């Protein structure tokens, strides 16, 4: 390929696809990655579902000319590093949770229930030593080993989180995202690794749709009103498309923000007032979280687009009112 003229290379994502795409781009070619879901659908419609290498290649060739198709964005080497650190963090957290559950379940089976949320390692070691005769030496030593494993996992998790923080800080977008209340290291690093250049989204709503925080539309043209008399425009539950981890982290960030608002730990502003209004309404808790998470995504999109840090005075104000406010501030100066 090094001797070929610059051309378009289409491919399905595979193991190491982003590194392969980066090497092809270094040779001067353009890379287009097409989701296997689209290839499978094309083969099913045009080749009677007969999956062969030739049919897959023919599908990729035809899908490359589909101007409505959204290809998979190739990730940079730095974004792949962030994804690797995040995967290691989740793996260690999962091991820690499973180990804690195993220790608690074993103690509970022997008649020593441990309350939820409690895992004092010193107390557990003393409990096992005090009842060594009941447990037996083999079970007691195994429980000590498992508790020490939780301690080692805590150290490893803290180390990986520190490395993830250092890697995230190298991204110029991190300082802008970290200024948003509710955006910590994990959602910021996931955003930097998954979303990519914010300029590829025409509006904040497209960013919300990319993450999966918009209603799922199912419009047929029938039944414009529900049984309660409210007009229904075909909007159902949350679409849940896109990256699941980023969506979950945005909702968790919204939960922490709602708790800060409920405890009056944030200054009074239109942004906080809108959240208080939602919390005071009769809407379910999770619907309020999705609303706040979507608002955080819109704010993050605006900050990255204009290169500004978060401001409580500007958040929650429409663009027209904000423009008028900026003009008044300029005249006063």
Where do the protein language model's features map onto the residues?
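Glycine-rich, often acidic, oxyanion-interacting loops/wings at catalytic, nucleic-acid
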Residues: 86-176, 317-320
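Short alpha-helix plus adjacent loop in nuclease-associated cores
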Residues: 25, 32-72, 123-131, 224-241
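Phosphate-backbone recognition surface of nucleic-acid-processing proteins
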Residues: 175-179, 185, 191-281, 285
